[in-house]
Amino acid sequence: MKLTCVVIVAVLFLTAWTFVMADDSRYGLKDLFPKARHEMKNPEASKLNKRDECFSPGTFCGIKPGLCCSAWCYSFFCLTLTF
């Protein structure tokens, strides 16, 4: 019985982790290569790492980690991790 509960909790945790860490399709690779080519011609014009609308650390991000500027949404809040 205990083993069954542990397995169920582990599966639920891994499923939730997969959904939280999944990439948002809005920031996919569809425009990455043309922008990268333009970046090679003019490195100052690079906007690949900038997002128009992102939340600063400490703000509520819900379940969409792509909305955080730092791309880390943990427990529904944007985080900034420094190593």
Curated annotation (Swiss-Prot):
InterPro entries reported in the protein's UniProt record: Conotoxin
Position of the signal peptide: 1-22
Tissue and organ distribution: Expressed by the venom duct.
GO CC annotation: extracellular region
One Pfam family this sequence matches: Conotoxin
Places the protein is found: Secreted
Primary location recorded for the protein, binned into one broad class: secreted
Function summary: Delta-conotoxins bind to site 6 of voltage-gated sodium channels (Nav) and inhibit the inactivation process.
Lineage: superkingdom: Eukaryota
4-hydroxyproline modified-residue sites: P57, P65
Gene Ontology MF, one: ion channel inhibitor activity
Origin species: Conus achatinus (Little frog cone)
Keywords from the named record: Cleavage on pair of basic residues, Disulfide bond, Hydroxylation, Ion channel impairing toxin, Knottin, Neurotoxin, Secreted, Signal, Toxin, Voltage-gated sodium channel impairing toxin
Cysteines joined through disulfide linkages: C54-C69, C61-C73, C68-C78
Family named by the database record: Belongs to the conotoxin O1 superfamily.
Domain notes: The presence of a 'disulfide through disulfide knot' structurally defines this protein as a knottin.
Protein name: Delta-conotoxin-like Ac6.1
Prosegment residue ranges: 23-51
